[in-house]
């Protein structure tokens, strides 16, 4: 890689440090890569959540919608944050750059949707340290005259790949 970014959260930044130690590249913290804020559920196991917030737990369990959880980051805000992260990474780099970013399993769904240019979130069990590898033409990303259906400009090389753990 030519550039390394990481969520500033401890576990992720430590993973980034370990994974890139041999390259000795600086790791740039990028706040927009942090995990989603689950509000009052933070730091609690499911039994504690159910005991302390039974109605919010029931609504979340039925809908899987974090907007029912007090103080949780709203879904719309997560989408905006993910789009901001993708747009920043694209705007700050050229096609010659190779970017490595370390993030979390919750926000990655929003990052993936933003990168794919879709409004729908796809459920995907993301493995710890799973790799997602994309090639994209950053210089033509925001141009309206770019052929969006041109498969050599945007390519998925790896998606949720944990084979390095085998």
Residue ranges with predicted function:
Residues 2, 97-103:
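Generic beta-sheet signal
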Residues 56-77:
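Short glycine/proline- and acidic residue-enriched helix-loop micro-motifs
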Residues 25, 36-48, 91, 95-97, ...:
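Acidic, low-complexity terminal tails and accessory targeting/binding regions
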Residues 79, 83-91, 112:
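Generic structural signal for well-ordered alpha-helical scaffold segments
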Residues 18, 110-114:
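Active-site signature of alpha/beta-hydrolase-fold catalytic machinery across serine-
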């Amino acid at each position: 890689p030519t550039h390394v970014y990481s969520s500033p959260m401890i576990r992720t930044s430590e993973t980034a440090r370990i994974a890139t130690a041999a390259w000795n590249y600086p790791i740039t913290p990028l706040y927009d890569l942090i995990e989603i804020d689950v509000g009052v559920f933070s730091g609690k196991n499911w039994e504690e959540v159910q005991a302390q917030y039974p109605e919010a737990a029931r609504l979340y369990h039925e809908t899987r919608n974090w907007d029912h959880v007090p103080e949780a980051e709203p879904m719309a805000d997560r989408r905006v944050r993910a789009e901001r992260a993708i747009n920043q990474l694209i705007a700050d780099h050229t096609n010659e750059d190779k970017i490595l970013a370390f993030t979390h399993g919750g926000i990655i769904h929003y990052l993936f949707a933003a990168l794919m240019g879709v409004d729908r979130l796809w459920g995907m069990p993301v493995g710890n340290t799973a790799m997602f590898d994309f090639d994209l033409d950053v210089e033509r990303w925001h141009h309206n005259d770019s052929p969006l259906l041109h498969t050599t400009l945007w390519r998925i090389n790896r998606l949720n790949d944990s084979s390095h753990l085998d």
